[in-house]
A protein has these predicted regions:
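Cofactor-centric catalytic regions
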Residues: 2-15, 28-165, 176-199, 255-261
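Hydrophobic/anchoring residues in structured secondary elements
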Residues: 25, 142-144, 205, 251
Length: 261
């Protein structure tokens, strides 16, 4: 999916001071953990990553307290410290418990309140061209600026933004859901359009890193961020070009034709 296993392995490796290739992320077992609620809020890196950071630091502290690991060490020395600990004391384990940020006020029973410990921010700028014969809109260039805390993996993060922007361009210009008799009438790739590589412009991704105290090494989640801003940016660019405000999505050619009279 979004590369969570890679990011979580990186967080553990950085906290332990070892290479990422030495970290295996075990498959999650929902029977062994409490209910964490619905799949929302782009929170895996921030919440699970913080737990992993805390547990990894605790594991390193255990080795240090046992006199098996110094302040500076190599991968070989870390491996040796782990082996020696197991030989002397048994299994080497570290545990971590999630603590919500103090300003969160959430009622699990009523499902009300503010459940978010941090927000990511973004600015999007779209350059568009409108064909005045066909009224087709094309996005020619796109700039996406994100403030997402510390970026753990720049390649994965940029890919997440680029993919989200491409999806949002489809939402803004192409993806028109037609309902008929309570059913989606255009549920085929022949009549439900999504952008292809030809329709996707160059996407310039810029990250501004402002560390968040509630995330691992200052990281925040970014999963849903690029779906929020591109459509308004595209609509604003069309308004700037044609002098008309469009108030519904997708912005189809017939929508512009009607608006221009």
């Amino acid at each position: 999916g979004q590369g969570a296993n890679t990011v979580l392995a990186q967080i553990a490796a950085e906290a332990l001071g070892i290479g990422c290739d030495l970290v295996d992320v075990a498959p999650p077992d929902t029977a062994a953990v409490p209910n964490s609620g619905p799949t929302v809020a782009s929170r895996t890196t921030m919440v699970v990553g913080k737990l992993i950071e805390s547990a990894a630091l605790g594991l390193k502290k255990t080795l240090t307290a046992a006199g098996l690991l110094g302040e500076v060490y190599s991968t070989r020395q870390f491996r040796a410290a782990c082996r020696d600990y197991v030989a002397l004391y048994g299994p080497l384990r570290a545990f971590s418990q999630y603590h919500a940020p103090p300003d969160i006020r959430w009622d699990d029973e009523r499902y009300r309140g503010d459940a978010y410990g941090a927000f990511a921010w973004a600015v999007y700028v779209a350059q568009v061209a409108v064909d005045m014969v066909t009224y087709e809109t094309r996005v020619e260039d796109f700039v996406a600026v994100q403030e997402v805390g510390r970026v753990v993996n720049p390649v994965l993060a940029a890919g997440q933004i680029e993919g989200g922007v491409a999806q949002a361009i489809g939402w803004a210009l192409y993806e028109n859901v037609v309902w008929r008799d309570g059913r989606m009438a255009n549920a085929r790739m022949t009549d439900y359009l999504i952008p292809t590589a030809v329709d996707t412009p160059p996407i310039h991704v810029v990250f501004i890193e402002n560390g968040c105290p509630h995330g691992p090494f200052g990281a925040k989640g970014i999963g849903e961020l690029p779906m929020d801003g591109p459509a308004p940016a595209i609509a604003s660019a069309i308004e700037n070009a044609l002098g008309i405000a469009v108030d519904r999505l997708p912005i189809l050619p017939e929508t512009l034709e009607q608006a221009l009279g």
